Amino acid sequence: MSLDLRARVREELERLKREGLYISPKVLEAPQEPVTRVEGREVVNLASNNYLGFANHPYLKEKARQYLEKWGAGSGAVRTIAGTFTYHVELEEALARFKGTESALVLQSGFTANQGVLGALLKEGDVVFSDELNHASIIDGLRLTKATRLVFRHADVAHLEELLKAHDTDGLKLIVTDGVFSMDGDIAPLDKIVPLAKKYKAVVYVDDAHGSGVLGEKGKGTVHHFGFHQDPDVVQVATLSKAWAGIGGYAAGARELKDLLINKARPFLFSTSHPPAVVGALLGALELIEKEPERVERLWENTRYFKRELARLGYDTLGSQTPITPVLFGEAPLAFEASRLLLEEGVFAVGIGFPTVPRGKARIRNIVTAAHTKEMLDKALEAYEKVGKRLGIIR
């Protein structure tokens, strides 16, 4: 690294530290479980996206081992050259069945799935209407297109309609929203958005990263939760790294959509395909949720209990509707201090501040899973009570 570049990088790092934005990730010293190990201590884990408890499940590990032994360590190529194997087709067929759509296409990253699908769908002359709290992958994906980009106030259907009225086009009108919003835990009002899209001849695009495996029958997602899963004008994109405990993303919808993405989605075209072990584990997760749908109900039982008890303690959880349960602290230093104190009490829950969330809205984001026991949640709640009183957040 040249001296000038080194100085530039150091200057930027110092700025991040001054502004309280510097990140130093915690290192987990045990598997991704509801109880794990951080900094040498056993902790209740409220920081992961392991919604259904699949990350270290014996069945998924066995499926991964089987596919590793049968198919080897890697795929060796991009999908369009020599990197599409029968196990990739098997996974896509399983995802389409699960989502209730004509087809599904697996992409190599959840983040770049949005870039790939949006880039393939949109061109100059199209207009996009995007919720202001959409995920960074949507924001970055839209920046790479030539479509006109308009932002509507969060979950504000009246504002969305104003924009639809004012911006007609002969091209595609695409309404883009998260299914479940990752910082607040609220659900997109698809029951209002989809009818509005029909009225103005628009297509709806849902990033269901935090809804898949959580909402709907057997965790089939936000779109299924609202009953729009067979609508050809609703495009679903989701990740394979959260509830399904793997890596990657996928798009589900009409067969023609899959064919278009195979030909035009750049992350699909230029990234090596999933290795066999990952696909084996993902297939195992989809098999398990069919056999054990009670996991989703257990997730919701735990979620309801944890939210109710936090409210009883006097915490503001920002009206969250899902297992994503933010606890509001306001200023980032306070949230980070609370996170540090919780860790001392044996609870791993991470503070989040600006720019991930607005200034004055710093919080600790908790995610309850199906694998947590009541005893684990009670330990976390006791820690929250102790820390909250120490910091003067609750009485």
Swiss-Prot record:
Activity's dependence on pH? Optimum pH is 6.0. Stable at pH 4.5-5.0, and a loss of less than 10% of the initial activity is observed after 1 hour of incubation at these pH.
Q: Which reaction does it catalyse?
A: 6-carboxyhexanoyl-[ACP] + L-alanine + H(+) = (8S)-8-amino-7-oxononanoate + holo-[ACP] + CO2; glycine + acetyl-CoA = (2S)-2-amino-3-oxobutanoate + CoA
What PROSITE patterns does the record tag this protein with? AA_TRANSFER_CLASS_2 (PS00599)
The residues the record assigns to binding substrate are 135, 356
Q: SUPFAM superfamilies, per this entry?
A: PLP-dependent transferases (SSF53383)
Record's keyword terms, sorted: Acyltransferase, Biotin biosynthesis, Pyridoxal phosphate, Transferase
> In UniProt terms, what function does this protein have?
Catalyzes the decarboxylative condensation of pimeloyl-[acyl-carrier protein] and L-alanine to produce 8-amino-7-oxononanoate (AON), [acyl-carrier protein], and carbon dioxide. Can also use pimeloyl-CoA instead of pimeloyl-ACP as substrate. It also converts 2-amino-3-ketobutyrate and CoA to glycine and acetyl-CoA. Activity is also observed with the following combinations of substrates: acetyl-CoA and either L-alanine or L-serine, pimeloyl-CoA and either glycine or L-serine, and palmitoyl-CoA with L-alanine.
What NCBIfam families does this protein map onto?
Answer: bioF, gly_Cac_T_rel, PRK06939.1
- Subunit composition and interactions: Homodimer.
UniProt protein name:
8-amino-7-oxononanoate synthase/2-amino-3-ketobutyrate coenzyme A ligase
